[in-house]
Amino acid sequence: MMDLLHCFATNVRYYRLKQKYSQEHLAELAGLHRTYISALERERRNISIENIERIANALGIEPYQLFMEGSDTDV
C-alpha cells in the first residue's frame, strides 16, 4: 500500500506530464509557485485542501483522482 503523500505526488506528476505541462505552467494555472509544485512532487511539502482543489482544476481532473492508487502512473 502506497502512503498518501507518495500517491498524491506520483499522481500530480503523472497528470501534469499527461497534459504536457511544465511545473511552471501547472503552477500558473493553479495560482501557485513553481517551487511549491516541485516540492509537492518530491514529497517535501504537505498540501491544503484548497490547493488540492486548485491543482485538480488546473489539471482538468477531480480531486479524488490525485489520491487513487494503481492508475497508469508509470511515467
Walk through the language-model features, giving the residues of each.
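Short basic helix-loop element that most often maps to the first helix and adjoining turn
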Residues: T10-H25, L29
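Conserved hydrophobic/aromatic packing and binding residues within compact polymer-binding modules
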Residues: V12, L26-A27, I37-L40, L66
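Residues within helix-turn-helix
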Residues: E24, T35, E53
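Recognition helix of helix-turn-helix/homeodomain-like DNA-binding domains
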Residues: L32-N46
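Short, basic-rich loop-to-helix N-cap that marks the start of a DNA-contacting helix
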Residues: R44-R54
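Hydrophobic micro-packing sites on short alpha-helices
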Residues: I52-A56, L66-F67
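Short, charged recognition helix plus adjacent turn
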Residues: Q65-V75
